[in-house]
Amino acid sequence: MKWLRSLVIFDRGGVASSPDWEKIHESYVRSIESIDFPKGKGFLKLRRKTKKPDGKYKRNGVGYLKQRFLDHLIKVEHWRAEGGFKIEKSEIQTVVSLYPSLESYREPITSMFGDFDFVTTTPSGLHVAIEWETGNISSSHRSMNKLAIALETGEIQVGVLIVPSRDLYDHLTDRIGNIKELSGYLIMWQKLGLHVHKGLLVISVVEHDELTD
């Protein structure tokens, strides 16, 4: 699999210029580039999407890609899977106004975000979280929001979302989150960085090496 590019959405406190970030980026890019099919060939070959008799398209699944990324990131790079940094509800509960009284009100928080897909802590103490996209575009938005909130509260200092390129998206399970559909919202997440003391939010874009019929 190819790593195409990493988009720095915001960088507060110079994290992107640190040796820690350089090592973290190299680590997960190695795991991206370890994903191949057929296994052992050193490149990722996928079947082109094909139209079925019912008019729907047959596409490649996404579970294999995440599993291969997980295997390398955990076993070779020594990250942790399904890890979290605790965010207290009191840290994110905000005061709003009720209409028409305009009284101050705190809406109860009845659910939390769950664990990140992958986490690690650098020798200097930077907490890092990665989300690997396997869901639809709504899932991508939730992942970005979760990373942004964790950065704002200081629970993590680096947050990364890994998503398919538009070309890869065409040949994967229908409606998976991808960079093209996220691109119009980057300005919103960028502005959230103004509230972060120290933190780096990144989207990394990945793609297949080859297509076959």
Which positions does each model-derived feature cover?
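Short acidic, S/G/P-rich loop/turn micro-motifs used as interaction or catalytic elements
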Residues: 135-139, 166-169
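Conserved beta-strand signature within the Rossmann-like core of class I S-adenosyl-L-methionine
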Residues: 155-165
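Active-site metal-binding core of divalent-cation-utilizing nuclease and nuclease-like domains
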Residues: 51-60, 68-124, 136-145, 152
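Domain-level recognition of nuclease-like catalytic cores that cleave nucleotide substrates
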Residues: 165-213
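Arginine/glycine-rich "motif VI" loop of SF2 helicases in the C-terminal RecA-like domain
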Residues: 150-156, 191-195
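Nuclease-adjacent, charged terminal/linker segments that flank catalytic cores
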Residues: 1-86
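Structural motif
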Residues: 126-128, 158
